[in-house]
């Protein structure tokens, strides 16, 4: 028997379950389980990756100054209030590590991103789940759950896996209603899919209790490189940088992200295609008796009659080489989360669901 005992609480942490990428016995699959951009990264980002290959023997920047400057220029933000990480997950981890510990509580919502309770437990804090209202964040429920032990509120807007979104006015009401010892963390992983939405940046600029995170994994198509960033008051950024590894991002990551964020024409193209096929996919599935809430992200949450039908449909889709995401772990056992793919992928999903429904009729 292993004589080494981990710190208390570590074995209570559930392993994160990512989207499937393979189906046994199926050679060619269409992966629609991880909310990846079907158009991939900007050609400028691809070229930046190639250009950095010959410099792999050189250590990267420790302060990410060029990437922070590019992000600041594109979004109109102060680069000194930006921190970069290995995906936005790492920035979220910095926040939990820096501001929570044993005896503290971290609020997340009923169908919120599964990393939030994991990050809380990693820091020794206690995750507190609050109910949503018809798969939409309930600000009043969050405020009612806050107490003297609360330190963080994690909020994804748009949300994953529901795709729903609350208004900027509601987010502001939440920030205004939190006591001074609580930080509001706005996870804007899908913010770019909403044209004109700043992900909460203006709220961060105006207050000292709000943090925003963003990622290059979704609309920028760089999920395989793992790059994210956060925007917060300078005092908080200073704290987070003290627990950040100095070389946490490689030269390739930094160059690709800088090229990607500067290519906003590519972002607009990806957003427009996603909007077109998200609308089409949701409408066609609704016609087949599979409704979904209005999504503001790059996926839809397709709802079936019950868990049995959802799981049966998932297996049917897999038999046709279509990989989507079961979300029972998000307290949504009767639903499947389907990434908005390209035209061929969306049409294949609708054809398969139609065949599934006809076979069960």
Swiss-Prot record:
Keywords: Amino-acid biosynthesis, Aminotransferase, Histidine biosynthesis, Pyridoxal phosphate, Transferase. Pathway: Amino-acid biosynthesis; L-histidine biosynthesis; L-histidine from 5-phospho-alpha-D-ribose 1-diphosphate: step 7/9. The keyword Amino-acid biosynthesis applies. GO terms for molecular function: histidinol-phosphate transaminase activity; pyridoxal phosphate binding. GO terms for biological process: L-histidine biosynthetic process. Its cofactor is pyridoxal 5'-phosphate. Its EC number is 2.6.1.9. It catalyses: L-histidinol phosphate + 2-oxoglutarate = 3-(imidazol-4-yl)-2-oxopropyl phosphate + L-glutamate. The modification N6-(pyridoxal phosphate)lysine is found at residue 218. NCBIfam families: hisC. Belongs to the class-II pyridoxal-phosphate-dependent aminotransferase family. Histidinol-phosphate aminotransferase subfamily. This is Histidinol-phosphate aminotransferase. It comes from Ruegeria pomeroyi (strain ATCC 700808 / DSM 15171 / DSS-3) (Silicibacter pomeroyi). The gene is hisC.
